[in-house]
Amino acid sequence: MQRINREESFRAKEERLKDLFVRGLSGNNAAYQTFLGELSSYLRAFLRKRLIRLPDEVEDLVQEALLAVHNQRHTYDPSQPLSAWVQAIARYKLVDLFRRRAIYEQRNDTLDDGMDLFSSADAEAAEARRDLNKLLADLPDHFRLPIMHTKLEGLSVREAADVSGMSESAIKVGVHRGLKALAAKIRGAL
């Protein structure tokens, strides 16, 4: 029921706009002015749905579409629905907007922004590495070596034991106690 009413309402609007437009094409200026006023409301709603994230562009695009309708009015075929013709023009204007924005964003996207991102990440990593090395340097070898081999170099407990000449148990205990000592040192520094 509601769908039928909506379709009837749409058809009535279509017929009204078409009548105003055809009368305007015949030289009736008042009908043409009314047509442009009503069409602008229709276009505004049509474009607002499609430009949810760019609401500031809606009014400009409405004006561009109205101008295009006016300039291309001689191409309208009265045997065809007016709404399809107007929507095609509005869609072309919408595509033009997206192209303009893409070109603008492409031209104005600086390469330096990407470099700053990586350089700051590198600088932060270097600072963290320096701070960690400073903290580890204060630990005795039986704590420092197990942490460096297992946590920083990614060796297994067995591999760390082989490299350092310590037992596997000593590696596990050294890591545990070394991390505990580092945590206490960091807490004391704060």
From Swiss-Prot:
InterPro entries: RNA_pol_sigma-70-like (IPR039425), RNA_pol_sigma-70_dom (IPR014284), RNA_pol_sigma70_r2 (IPR007627), RNA_pol_sigma70_r4_t2 (IPR013249), RNA_pol_sigma_r2 (IPR013325), RNA_pol_sigma_r3/r4-like (IPR013324), WH-like_DNA-bd_sf (IPR036388). Residues 157-176 bind DNA. Residues 130-182 are annotated as: Sigma-70 factor domain-4. SUPFAM superfamilies: Sigma2 domain of RNA polymerase sigma factors, Sigma3 and sigma4 domains of RNA polymerase sigma factors. GO terms for molecular function: DNA binding; sigma factor activity. A motif (Polymerase core binding) lies at residues 60-73. It holds the Pfam family Sigma70_r4_2. One of its GO terms (cellular component) is cytoplasm. Its main location: cytoplasm. GO terms for biological process: DNA-templated transcription initiation. Signal peptide: none annotated. It comes from the Bacteria. Disruption phenotype: Growth inhibited by 100 uM chlorite during aerobic log-phase growth, no expression of the SigF regulon (Dsui_0156 to Dsui_0159). Growth of a double sigF-yedY2 mutant is completely inhibited by 20 mM chlorite. Keywords: Cytoplasm, DNA-binding, Sigma factor, Stress response, Transcription, Transcription regulation. It is found in: Cytoplasm. Interacts transiently with the RNA polymerase catalytic core formed by RpoA, RpoB, RpoC and RpoZ (2 alpha, 1 beta, 1 beta' and 1 omega subunit) to form the RNA polymerase holoenzyme that can initiate transcription. Belongs to the sigma-70 factor family. ECF subfamily. This is ECF RNA polymerase sigma factor SigF. It comes from Azospira oryzae (strain ATCC BAA-33 / DSM 13638 / PS) (Dechlorosoma suillum). The gene is sigF.
